[in-house]
Each structure stands twice: as C-alpha cells, then as structure tokens.
C-alpha cells in the first residue's frame, strides 16, 4: 500500500501520482488550469494572513496578556503558518516552480501548524470547561503560567507528530519499512480518541452553561467564540484529514473522491482565515448599537470576568471556618 501524505496537505503535494506524466506537476492538468480555484484560494489565504497577522500584532502589543489570550495568540500563529505554507504551495504548483526543498518545508510546516491548531483548540476548550466545573480552583489554585507551559508542550507534541508524519509518510525516507503505518495509527489515536473527544465533550459542557445561563457573570462571549471556533474547525478542517486517512487505508476510492481534495483544502484555509473575523464580530455584539474599533472589540471578547459572584465569596469559601 503506497503511503499517502496525511493530515492537511492536499492534492498539490500528497495525492498519489494518478493522471501524472513527466510534463505535469503533482496536480492533474484539470486542476492546474483551474484559475478560478487558484484565485479564490489565494484571496482567502491573503485575507487570512492579513487577519491573523493583525490579530497577532494586537495580542502582542496592544492587549493585556491573559491566560486565554496566550492560547489565542498561539492559535493565530499556527493558523498563519498554515495559510502561508498553503499559499506557497499553490504558487509553486500553479506556476510550475520545481523546488523540492521549498515544497518539503512548506508541507512540513503546514502539517505542523494544522496539528498545533487542533491541540490548542482542545486545550482552550478543556481549560474553559474546567473553569465552569471547578470555578474556585480556576480562580485561586490555577498555576500562574499554566497557559504558556501548556502551549509550549503542545507545540512540542506537534513537532513530534508532524516530524514523524513528514519523515516516514511524506518524504518516505524508509519506504521499505512499515513505520508509516504505525505513525498513522499513533496519529489517529491521538486525534480521534484523545483530542477530538475532549474538544467535543468540553464544548458540550460550555454549550449547556451558555444555554442554562446559571451564572450570569460568566464570560458568555468567551464561550461563544470557543464553541464557534471549534465547530468551524470540525466542519471545515477535519474532513481533509479524515479523507486522507481513509485514502491511506483504502485503495479503492473513486477518482471523484480525490478530485474533492483541493476543495477540502480550500475549506481548511477558510477555517484558518475566519477565526479573527469571529473574534471581531462576537466582540462587537452589544445591546446598545455603537461602533467599536478593532482593538476595543478584541479587548471586549477576550475579557475574563470572575466566574463566581464575588471575590469575597471565593475567599470566604476557601478559608477554614
């Protein structure tokens, strides 16, 4: 069974060599000539790069650092990486620029960014879920640098997973050995048995919290953007990974299924591009209609109000009688 490059990267670099002749690039001629697809994809990536770049700048220089904004900053960096590498790959394949080194690094860093985004979204969901289930611990016992440490560990995990996928399954350094199969199994377990279930379960709890509105002072906007971002990721970004995994284990997929891969890749770039828009729109929502600057909207949406009625109650509850 031929290894099929997994995770995010699409038809441009990872599709098996069907419809391929020495005079063609990795895409079939049908997709290479599809200038509409190329232009739309490039516009999406360009807007996403601008939006995430602006978000990164605001989070670093203009908005006070908080536990939640640390996660959002790292997520924006991961999305920026995916969009940049996707843009490079589209330009390389459209203009027939043959550069294996550039292509290899673009694939590696895009897989790296995709995996990191998945891990960070799960961490964000789990942490907010814990703030709902254990509000006193979150206010009083949560380690000060937990967000930064968690982000570093998740980046390290992504380096491991992405490096294994790239080394054994994409570059095929040792194609005569079955390591790629084990890498796929490890990646599938990590994704579909650990991170995705945690993400979904945590967001179900947040959804119940928002619907029941048991504690009015809870940062509802924060929960809304978390749930929206996760739903967008599951709808737009996950189908690519699922299809490529199925393609690795099934040699009987119809060509029409492979033809959908470039469009699934476009959906994944939409997912990376739309997050800053979600933050701004949710941050701008207000009962009183008033225009807000981008900075004010972001500050509003990233506010973390106390999750209990008052600090006195927390102190009274936590001190021995």
Swiss-Prot record:
Segments traversing the membrane: 36-56, 72-92, 103-126, 148-168, 189-209, 226-246, 248-271
Q: Which InterPro entries does the record associate with it?
A: GPCR_Rhodpsn (IPR000276), GPCR_Rhodpsn_7TM (IPR017452), MRGPCRFAMILY (IPR026234), MRGPCRH (IPR026221)
Q: Does the keyword Transmembrane helix apply?
A: yes
Topological domain (Extracellular) residues are 1-35, 93-102, 169-188, 247
Q: Which domain of life is it from?
A: Eukaryota
As for membrane topology, the entry says:
Multi-pass membrane protein
Location relative to the cell: Cell membrane
Q: Which GO terms describe its cellular component?
A: plasma membrane
Q: Pfam families from the xrefs?
A: 7tm_1
Q: Give me the glycosylation sites of this protein.
A: 23, 99
Q: Which residues lie on this side of the membrane: Cytoplasmic?
A: 57-71, 127-147, 210-225, 272-320
Keywords (alphabetical) are:
Cell membrane, G-protein coupled receptor, Glycoprotein, Membrane, Receptor, Transducer, Transmembrane, Transmembrane helix
**Which SUPFAM superfamilies does this entry report, sorted A to Z?**
Family A G protein-coupled receptor-like
Q: Which GO terms describe its molecular function?
A: G protein-coupled receptor activity
Primary location recorded for the protein, binned into one broad class:
membrane
Its biological purpose = Orphan receptor. May regulate nociceptor function and/or development, including the sensation or modulation of pain.
Q: Which family does it belong to?
A: Belongs to the G-protein coupled receptor 1 family. Mas subfamily.
What is the protein name given in its UniProt record?
Answer: Mas-related G-protein coupled receptor member H
Gene field? Mrgprh
